[in-house]
Swiss-Prot record:
Subunit-level organization: Monomer.
Protein origin, superkingdom: Bacteria
Organism in which the protein naturally occurs: Prochlorococcus marinus (strain NATL2A)
The protein, known as: 3-phosphoshikimate 1-carboxyvinyltransferase
Pathway: Metabolic intermediate biosynthesis; chorismate biosynthesis; chorismate from D-erythrose 4-phosphate and phosphoenolpyruvate: step 6/7
Main localization (coarse): cytoplasm
Reactions the enzyme catalyzes: 3-phosphoshikimate + phosphoenolpyruvate = 5-O-(1-carboxyvinyl)-3-phosphoshikimate + phosphate
Record's signal peptide: none
UniProt: 3-phosphoshikimate binding residues: 29-30, 34, 177, 179, 329, 356
PROSITE patterns found in the cross-reference section: EPSP_SYNTHASE_1, EPSP_SYNTHASE_2
Length: 444
């Protein structure tokens, strides 16, 4: 099953076979980035257990090392040790900081560097990242006094940042984005006076939880916690962090277990932060057979195991802008799930997906149509007509990790075998995806 051909990026995908067993998804990508960044600017030692050893967090770690932060080698199963340098201890790097494919790395580091006075930094990334919008972060940072420059009026990398004296501000973000919010909060740690971020809707709150744990003077208020205020002056102190499993990675197994006949899965150690559990709400709307068990609290984050069993006659669903911040990364695999619902599913308010690693709305529509699905693409979403069988064919992840894994699940439900180009993209967030899929798949 799933053996790569001589071209390692081209993978053969076999149809059929239920998925059965237990799977532990890798550490949460969002939390992994933040643990590295906050540990770097804390005083003292930070220990991280369960850090995601995938390409995106590795990019963050390498950028921090280039600025003088000592981080132990990142290997699966190892506890990672960081020697923090304090809020103003980052060194001016001798070379360009390469963020790879990671938008989170670039955007959060922009906030981190904005207040490193008189230091000069240049950030770049791969072709995909160099075409993703950065002014949405640079503009609010400029309101605090940051000096940020880049291509296309500061919107595209490479970016040049000259550390400057920052001042606190009240900043309303145009979209509910944890990346924008977190960049501002990082900059606020080095500003004169308090900074308040006001979001149009609540986004994932890992930064707030973790900054509090590190000792930052941070308050959350306003309707639904949309106002976040940081007052500078307190040093961060190194912590011991345990990273739970990533619910965005778990989503592939939750949908697969729901749509593939005969499947029975337990996804273990999944982070259940309420700002991330929109996927569970949609599965409930689909009337999928899932149960959350062994609920517990780990290092300030709710965690549990999720059982999922195949169920016939899944209901179609509707997703709008209100829930979107809680499941934005799960839209590709939910699009696959919609193909096997009895009726028409609608996804709206998802225009943010057009500026991810790829234009995920266009790519999912294109690839699912190639398989014979009935999909209408709109400016801010998709309409998917369920109940139509899928055909095996030549598929392409277009270098997007979430697309690669979503198409892998879709291919199991096709009526003939498929191939997937650029399958290695899965390693961006889930290095063991293909081996886990092979282990879980039971051939008839």
């Amino acid at each position: 099953m799933n053996a790569p051909t001589k071209d390692q990026s081209l993978r053969n995908l076999q149809k059929g076979g239920e998925l059965c067993g237990k799977v532990k998804v890798p550490g949460d990508k969002s939390i992994s980035h933040r643990a590295l960044l906050f540990g770097a600017i804390a005083k003292g030692k930070t220990l991280i257990e369960g850090l995601l050893p995938a390409e995106d967090p590795l990019s963050t770690a390498e950028c921090l090392r280039s600025m003088g932060v000592k981080i132990s080698p990142i290997k699966k199963g190892d506890i990672i040790e960081i020697e923090g340098v304090g809020l103003n201890g980052l060194q001016e790097p001798q070379d360009i900081l390469n963020c790879g494919n990671s938008g989170t790395t670039m955007r959060l580091i922009m906030g981190l560097l904005a207040g490193q006075k008189d230091h000069h930094f240049i950030l770049t990334g791969d072709k995909s990242l160099r075409n993703r919008p950065m002014k949405r972060v640079g503009q609010p940072l400029k309101m605090m006094g940051a000096k940020v420059f880049g291509r296309c009026g500061g919107n595209l990398a490479p970016l040049s940042i000259i550390g400057n004296k920052l001042r606190g501000a009240v900043i309303g973000t145009p979209v509910a984005s944890a990346q924008i919010k977190s960049a501002i909060l990082l900059a606020a740690l080095n500003a004169e006076g308090s900074t308040t971020v006001i979001e149009p809707a609540r986004s994932r709150d890992h930064s707030e939880r973790m900054l509090k744990a590190f000792g930052a003077n941070l308050e959350v208020g306003g309707e639904m916690g949309r106002h976040i205020t940081v007052s500078p002056g307190k040093d961060l102190k190194g912590q011991s962090i345990i990273v739970p499993g990533d619910i965005s990675s778990a989503a592939f197994w939750l949908i697969a277990g729901s749509i593939i006949p005969g499947s029975e899965l337990v996804v273990e150690n999944v982070g259940l932060n309420p700002t991330r559990t929109g996927i569970l709400d949609v599965l409930e709307e689909m009337e999928a057979n899932i149960n959350v068990i062994n609920k517990r609290d780990v290092a300030g984050e709710p965690v549990g195991d999720i059982e999922v069993f195949y169920k016939e006659n899944l209901k179609p669903f509707k997703i709008d802008g209100e829930i979107m911040p809680r499941l934005v990364d799960e839209i590709p695999i939910l699009s696959v799930g919609a193909c096997f619902c009895n009726g028409i599913s609608q996804i709206k308010g998802a225009s943010e997906l057009r500026v991810k690693e790829t234009d995920r709305l266009a790519v999912m529509a294109r690839q699912l149509k190639r398989m014979g699905a009935s999909v209408d693409e709109h400016q801010d979403g998709l309409t998917i007509y369920g109940g139509k069988s899928l055909e095996g064919c030549e598929l392409d992840s277009e270098d997007d990790h979430r697309i690669a894994m979503s198409l892998a699940i879709a291919s199991i439900m096709a009526n003939s075998n498929s191939t997937l180009r650029r399958s290695e993209a899965a390693a961006i967030s889930y290095p063991d995806f293909w081996s886990d899929l092979k282990r879980l798949q039971q051939k008839n």
